[in-house]
Structure formats: structure tokens, C-alpha cells
Amino acid sequence: KSEGTDMMKSISVKIRKGAMAYLKRQYKTVGIFFAIMFFILTVLAAKRFLSPFVPCAFLTGGFFSGLSGYVGMNIATYANTRTANGVRDGLNKGLKIAFASGSVMGLTVVGLGLFDISVWFILLKFVFKLSINDVMTAMLTFGMGASSMALFARVGGGIFTKAADVGADLVGKV
């Protein structure tokens, strides 16, 4: 679908650049948290309090959650002007574009999560022949990594959105 007028395309590029700059900064900050958590989990695994697979499961959970966020941000910024342009031809067309782009994001999150947890299950249960308790511990840690990344994205996204709202209010008043 078309991105619309030249003005819409220009605004879209600026939004996309700002969103990607935000995401890059956020992922650098979250990377520090993940490095610290990986170190802590590795120490616990070395002392045999945890399975040696737990630190890697935590990292892959965070990685796939972050990848979902990156894909979602790209889809959202590309669909933004296409949806606005579609609405010019009727609400139904704009709704279809928005629904399709939102569906892609939802399926990406579920697909990446299912892929990662399936790989972990197959590796741990059938390749390394671990007990089901050890497999479940690693899978729960995968979920902890994914949830940690999602939490940072949620909190950071709320702050980013509020800053954008304040900026829009200031522009509207000036």
C-alpha cells in the first residue's frame, strides 16, 4: 500500500528514525540488566544451584522478546502512514491495514516464543536427556527473560509515549 503524500512520507521517516533511536537506546540499557542477570545466573549454575542451561535460557527469552519488539516497532512505523493514507479512501480500508499490521505483530510474538521454547524443549529433553524438572526450570527461566524484556519495553514505552504527548501539546500551543 502507498505511504501517502510526500508530507506523510516525510513525517513517517522522522517518526521511524525517532522510534529506532529510542529502541536502540533502550536495548543498550536493558542489555546491561541482562548482562548482570546472566552473570548472577551463571554463578548460581556454577555452584550447582541451577541447571547450567538456565543462564542461556534467560538470555534467549530476552533476545526473542526484544526481537519481537524490534519487529513490532518496524511494522508499526511502516503501517502508520499506510493506515492514515488508507483512511483517506474510507475507514474500512484503514481498518484493514491496521488490523493486518497488528496481526503480523501478534503472530510474530507467538511464533518466536513458540519456536524458542520448542527448541529448548527438544534440546534439553531429547538431546541432553534431562529430567522433566530440569527442562521446566530452563523453560521457566526463558519466560523470565522474555518477561523482563517485555517489562522494560512496557515501562520505557510508556515514558516515551508520555514524552511524545508532551511534545505534541507544546507544538499545538506554540
Feature roles, as predicted:
Residues K1-V174:
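Hydrophobic, small-residue-rich transmembrane alpha-helices and their short perimembrane loops
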